[in-house]
Design a protein with these regions (language model features):
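Helix-turn-helix DNA-binding segment
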Residues: 3-43, 69-71, 75-78
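Positions in alpha-helical segments
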Residues: 6, 49-50
Length: 82
């Protein structure tokens, strides 16, 4: 989690954006995030848009994939069938 927080700070995310970003990574919907943070869904959508803009990533899937990429690197030997 520290590595993720450092990356959020590197991107210049505000504290609120960091909280939303972490919930996005955990797979919560905008509606669920709004309920958890006791705010409007529109606010969460705006924060998500700011997160994607600051990170230079295009949407939720690319945002999540950015963090998963290091874990999903497959050795060529592991990728061969059977």
């Amino acid at each position: 989690a520290e590595t993720i927080q450092r990356q959020f700070q590197h991107w210049g995310l505000t504290l609120s954006e960091q909280q939303v970003a972490m919930l996005l990574l955990k797979g919560l919907s905008f509606r669920e995030i709004a309920a958890v943070r006791q705010t409007r869904e529109k606010t969460v959508r705006q924060q998500a848009s700011a997160i994607y803009g600051k990170s230079g990533l295009d949407g939720r899937h690319e945002f999540s994939a950015w963090f998963l990429e290091d874990f999903l690197v497959v050795d060529a030997g592991e990728a061969s069938p059977g």
